[in-house]
A protein has these predicted regions:
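Bacterial Sec-dependent N-terminal signal peptides
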Residues: 1-27
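Active-site SXXK
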Residues: 55, 75, 100-129, 133, ...
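Extracellular/periplasmic catalytic domains that process cell-envelope and extracellular macromolecules
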Residues: 63, 93-94, 124, 154-161, ...
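Short loop/turn microsegments at loop-to-beta-strand junctions
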Residues: 65-67, 78, 390-393, 402
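Short, surface-exposed loop or secondary-structure junction motifs
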Residues: 140-381
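Short, well-ordered beta-strand elements
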Residues: 394, 401-410
């Protein structure tokens, strides 16, 4: 009997050990993107073809040169294509691994860097930013502005800007060029860069100068999309002792296996940068000049020195899908934990209350789909998203376990409704 019990014990240990190893392997596989047949991951291959057809229509009508798109369902890549052209004159196909200027999609990555340091106990989210960047001490708020000569008067701010204010775009900072008229003029006079193609400038120098300028409104009282995440990028540099580029590479890109994400591309990848287009007076595709709104088209290929946390990155849709899968996995990807589940929860929930009256809200670096927003689009409540100036969009839907991105490169683009149609097409193809 003792021998029998011993045998059963050994078998039980072996079974338990084998089960644990199998479970660990399955967990690891689930955390890594795998390309698969749509039918094996709950998608209709036939209905996915509607995406090809819709994008091709936009190409044929000369509304866009081309687009890349990817859909991930529960870690399985069910759609991953480039459609149309990179160079429409030469009929060069747009490859699915093309590198795109992702502009404001940089914000979520910078916000992640901030939360990594927050988890290390380097600061609290309600700390004053002036504790780390003294130039933001004793802020003032714009009172009156003279359009004739850009002079202005100010009033004292009721309180200082916090790190949380910056993460939620409630600090009172605005954007050059695309911001409010008065603040755009004020920033232009002070030569404050938007973050894109800040030739010859460095992040620290420009953020310190920004700190001396007035705010659009009192901190914490309104939602204003602005240079907040550029300030956060410099916070990462100050606290970590690394450049933002180095921090991204060491703490996010390398652990996740994001091999094509950079502020400035290595020369070996220059030829993969997608061609940027504009449109003519009839809203048809047109070759862009060497610069658009003062931004050189080839700025990712210039080995620059300004690392804009708000808009400086270039990347591929595959790399960004990895980044988003990490969030759907609760902060982990392929066995590498980047964030805690708690930080992921905080980043992907409404952090601004009713400060913004639209159907969407804002978390810590992401737009958030509310119940009201879900009533107006296929995305489920709790989905999180954003996009980029040059025509890129992404979202993740935790309820359906969907990640989707569509990328074009065109400014301006009067046919941005392609993004809305893509959202519909992603969900209609679910089995």
């Amino acid at each position: 009997m003792r021998k029998l019990n011993l045998l059963l014990l050994v078998l039980n240990i072996a079974f338990t050990s084998g089960y644990a190893q199998t479970a660990a392997v399955e967990k690891k596989l689930a955390l890594t993107l795998v390309e698969t047949e749509p039918s094996a991951a709950g998608y209709s291959k036939e209905r996915l073809q509607r995406i090809d057809q819709t994008i091709q229509q936009y190409v044929d009508k000369q509304w866009i040169a081309g687009a890349t798109a990817i859909i991930v369902h529960d870690g399985k890549i069910v759609y991953y294509k480039g459609i149309g052209y990179d160079d429409i004159d030469k009929k060069t196909p747009l490859k699915r691994d093309a590198i795109f200027r992702i502009a404001s999609q940089t914000k979520a990555i910078t916000s992640t860097a901030v939360m990594i340091l927050y988890e290390e106990g380097k600061f609290l989210l309600d700390d004053r930013i002036s504790k780390y960047i003294p130039e933001f001490a004793k802020p003032k708020v714009l009172d009156k502005f003279n359009k004739a000569d850009s002079t202005y008067t100010t009033i004292p701010a009721k309180r200082e800007i916090t790190i949380r204010d910056l993460l939620t775009h409630t600090s009172g900072l605005d954007y050059p060029e695309i911001g409010s008229e008065n603040m755009a003029a004020l920033y232009a006079k002070a030569d404050i860069p938007s973050g894109l193609d800040a030739k010859g400038k460095t992040l620290g120098t420009e953020i310190k100068r920004l700190g001396s300028l007035p705010l659009l409104h009192q901190p914490g009282e309104k939602f204003t999309y602005g240079l907040n995440t550029d300030v956060l990028g410099y916070l990462v540099e100050v606290v970590s002792g690394m450049s933002l580029s180095e921090f991204f590479a060491r703490r996010i890109f390398e652990p996740l296996g994001m091999k094509d994400s950079y502020f400035y591309l290595p020369s070996s990848k220059y030829n993969r940068l997608a061609t940027l287009y504009t449109e003519d007076s009839l809203h048809h595709l047109a070759k862009a000049p060497e610069s658009v709104n003062g931004i050189r088209l080839n700025y990712p290929n210039t080995n620059g020195t300004y690392f804009s946390g708000g808009g400086g990155l270039s990347s591929t849709m595959y790399d960004y899908a990895i980044f988003m899968q990490m969030f759907l996995n609760g902060g982990e990807y392929n066995g590498k934990r980047i964030l805690s589940r708690s930080s992921v929860r905080m980043m992907t929930m409404n952090q601004i209350g009713d400060l913004y009256q639209g159907s969407g809200k804002f978390g810590l670096g992401f737009g958030i789909t509310t119940e009201r927003g879900s009533a107006r689009s296929p995305l489920n409540e709790g989905s999180f998203d954003w996009g980029g100036y040059f025509g890129t969009t992404y979202w993740a839907d935790p309820k359906e376990k969907i990640i989707a991105l569509i990328m074009t490169q065109q400014v301006p683009n009067s046919h941005g409704d392609l993004t809305s149609k893509f959202k519909i097409l992603v969900y209609q193809a679910l089995e």
